[in-house]
Each structure stands twice: as C-alpha cells, then as structure tokens.
A protein has these predicted regions:
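Beta-strand secondary-structure signal
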Residues: 62-64, 131-135, 149-151
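Positively charged n-region of N-terminal signal peptides that target proteins for export
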Residues: 1-4
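Short beta-strand elements
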Residues: 144-163
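Short, surface-exposed binding/anchoring microloops in extracellular/periplasmic proteins
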Residues: 34-89
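Classical Sec-dependent N-terminal signal peptides that target proteins to the secretory pathway
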Residues: 10-11
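Bacterial signal peptide processing site
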Residues: 22-24
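C-terminal motif of bacterial Sec signal peptides marking the signal peptidase cleavage site
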Residues: 16-20
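Short, solvent-exposed, Trp/other aromatic-anchored flexible loops in extracytoplasmic proteins
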Residues: 90-144
Length: 163
C-alpha cells in the first residue's frame, strides 16, 4: 500500500510540473492587425496597399501606382516615399530611389514594393488614420524636378476580438 501511495504522489508531482510547461491558448494567441490603404488625385492613383502587423513581424506593401495622365513620361529618376505626419514631424515608413544611368527613362507605374521589419516602432497604429501620405519626387530628362503628395485613406481590415 505504501508503494502505491508513493507512486501516486510521484505521478501527481510530475503531472503538476508538466502542466506549467504546456502552451496555453492565451500564450499561443497572436494579435494580428491588417490595414489597407489607397488614394488618388488628378496625376496618379495608389491601390492595394496593405500593412500587416502581428507580434513577430511588421510588413508594409506599397501597393500599385498607376499614372492617370501621360505627363510623367520623360522621367529619368524618381523617389517614392510613404510617411506618417505626426504633428510637424514626417516619420518615414518606406522610401526608395530609382535613377536611369544610361540616359533613358524610367516608368513610375506598377508595383511599389514592400518592406518588413520594425516599420511601426516610431508611430502608433492610431496615427495611421488621416496621417498616411505618399510622396513622389521626379526628375525629367531636362533636369526639371517635380514633387507630388497624396494623402492616403487607411481602413482597418481586421476586427478586434472580444474575449
């Protein structure tokens, strides 16, 4: 009888230790937020932009840029920048430069690209609404520079779960 009690107490102690090692559903649950954005003016339109945020990764998809008029056909270089205005401060989320070194032109339309990493560390998600902008700076073959800014409409796609 003493052996059975010792075995049962040992088994109970082992089970108690291993219960703390299991992954609870609360620990496995990750917060996921998905935002879409778009915008347009008389020169160009941006569609299909997406921001994906979870506890392990932040990804910013710039979407597609479509030129609405063919006024920007002699572009030799451009800079595309997404940023959030926070007060008077411009917080850049993604920016890149393209320049043709052969004397030809580059096309501004098409896929804008994506970036992953700590994109949103400087801003809060509440700052995205009404504060996300796209800036296009171009230089044509004659060296003339132009700058265009577009405020983007941000929509949260995910809904917060009530627990």
């Amino acid at each position: 009888m003493k052996k059975i009690v010792v075995i049962l107490l040992s088994a109970l102690a082992c089970c108690t230790m291993f219960i703390g090692c299991s992954n609870s559903s609360a620990n496995q649950e990750q917060h996921l937020s998905v935002y879409s954005f778009s915008g347009e003016d008389e020169q160009f339109a941006i569609s299909n932009g997406v921001i994906v945020l979870n506890s392990t990764e932040e990804t910013f998809y710039g979407g597609d840029l479509k030129e609405k008029q063919d006024k920007l056909s002699d572009i030799a270089a451009y800079t595309k920048t997404f940023y959030v205005m926070s007060g008077n401060e411009k917080k850049i989320l993604m920016s890149f430069v393209v320049e043709d070194m052969t004397g030809g032109t580059v096309n501004i339309s098409g896929d804008i690209g994506k970036i992953s990493g700590d994109i949103m560390t400087k801003i809060g998600t509440d700052e995205l609404q009404n504060n996300l902008f796209f800036e296009l700076k171009t230089t044509d073959l004659n060296g003339e520079e132009n700058e265009f800014q577009l405020q983007l409409t941000v929509t949260e796609v995910t809904e917060k779960a009530d627990n």
